[in-house]
Amino acid sequence: MTSRRTRARERALQALYQIDVAAEGIDDALSRFWKSFEPVEREVMDLAEGLVRGVAQHRRAVDEAIEAVSTNWRLDRMAKVDRNVLRLAVFELLRTDVPVKVVINEAIELGKKYGSESSGAFVNGVLDKVASGLPPARRGER
């Protein structure tokens, strides 16, 4: 069985994708999103909403961090799944204390599950570059 945080990331990715495609406000999108799914544990729902709202709140910084390392790739040219996997992961890298390796591994798995054949490798490459720019203590180095 997958962890609550893993399930929350999956739901957060799905909600971010829906928001990206529908271009609607976050509150309306989340309300509609939760109505379209089987009920989930309150903790999973709360974690997912926290991630979605965090990405939305810090979207400019998140997008800038992605674009700074995405050579020859503008965000608007990326596949929607890849773009939102990256947004979710970069938010976690920049704004949470979740271990860097965990964030990257979970993002790669989301890319493989929901993206194209090359999504996992693409996500890995971008996130490795973002992570290399983090302070050593954040990367788990001494």
Swiss-Prot record:
SUPFAM superfamilies: NusB-like. One of its GO terms (biological process) is transcription antitermination. One of its GO terms (molecular function) is RNA binding. Keywords: RNA-binding, Transcription, Transcription antitermination, Transcription regulation. GO terms for cellular component: cytosol. PANTHER family: ANTITERMINATION NUSB DOMAIN-CONTAINING PROTEIN (PTHR11078:SF3), N UTILIZATION SUBSTANCE PROTEIN B-RELATED (PTHR11078). Involved in transcription antitermination. Required for transcription of ribosomal RNA (rRNA) genes. Binds specifically to the boxA antiterminator sequence of the ribosomal RNA (rrn) operons. NCBIfam families: nusB (TIGR01951). Belongs to the NusB family. This is Transcription antitermination protein NusB.
